[in-house]
């Protein structure tokens, strides 16, 4: 039995630069990981069975990203004669990341399954192959597979490794879940932010094109951001619902968390450029 980290991510900035004919939005964003997240426990099996021991209420196992990722790896490795006979697993997840929070929980779980099972089964797929598989599961999965902070373009799959400052963050959950399509389908969402170079963006004040829509449609997000902004620079991550404030020290972040109103759930974590999953493989 082995335990594998499935870390959260933050979008330190997020700009929507266009919309493709297939409906997907093109963007420019900066991904950084947190030293905080879910934990997957994986017990390899030799009878070919795949079991999720911690099902999610209302989500059939075969639709769960964890199971879908495992099946996808099984199929890809089998088709290239790299799946040892009888490969299977019992998988359980200790969830700390909220669904619909903008922290990448489901995508991170999928990436951890791909990376961990490839290692435990000895399939020998490359990082590039795993990232390509991950993209079939979601646009955010490849960055978790690669495990390095990155500037992302396209629909989020064109990644350039970067080294943003590793600050401390107070991440707050306003108590609502925001499905990504709710934000991306909003007619008022900016969809024509000019594309800029990495260097230009890294030297500008960071912001998120989705933030205004999230604040307008969800008063809880507005209230959380209004409270955080009293203490530090704060933004929405992804399409929400989580918001974060940045600090130079852990103690400063914890001091603010200690004064948080009862309706605001939060945690303090450090931004890291090498993900805990990547570190687990070193």
Curated annotation (Swiss-Prot):
Keyword terms of this UniProt record: ATP-binding, Isoprene biosynthesis, Kinase, Nucleotide-binding, Transferase
Instruction: Supply the InterPro entries for this chain.
Output: GHMP_kinase_C_dom, GHMP_kinase_C_sf, GHMP_kinase_N_dom, IspE, Ribosomal_Su5_D2-typ_SF, Ribsml_uS5_D2-typ_fold_subgr
Which GO BP terms, alphabetically?
isopentenyl diphosphate biosynthetic process, methylerythritol 4-phosphate pathway; terpenoid biosynthetic process
Enzyme class, UniProt record, top EC level:
transferase
Q: Please tell me where ATP binds in this chain.
A: 98-108
Q: What is its EC number?
A: 2.7.1.148
Record's keyword annotation contains DNA damage? no
Pathway field of the UniProt record reads:
Isoprenoid biosynthesis; isopentenyl diphosphate biosynthesis via DXP pathway; isopentenyl diphosphate from 1-deoxy-D-xylulose 5-phosphate: step 3/6
Q: Which Pfam families match?
A: GHMP_kinases_C, GHMP_kinases_N
Q: Which reaction does it catalyse?
A: 4-CDP-2-C-methyl-D-erythritol + ATP = 4-CDP-2-C-methyl-D-erythritol 2-phosphate + ADP + H(+)
A molecular function (GO) held by this record is:
ATP binding
Q: Please name the catalytic residues of this protein.
A: 9, 140
UniProt lists the family membership as follows: Belongs to the GHMP kinase family. IspE subfamily.
Quaternary data: Homodimer.
Protein name according to UniProt: 4-diphosphocytidyl-2-C-methyl-D-erythritol kinase
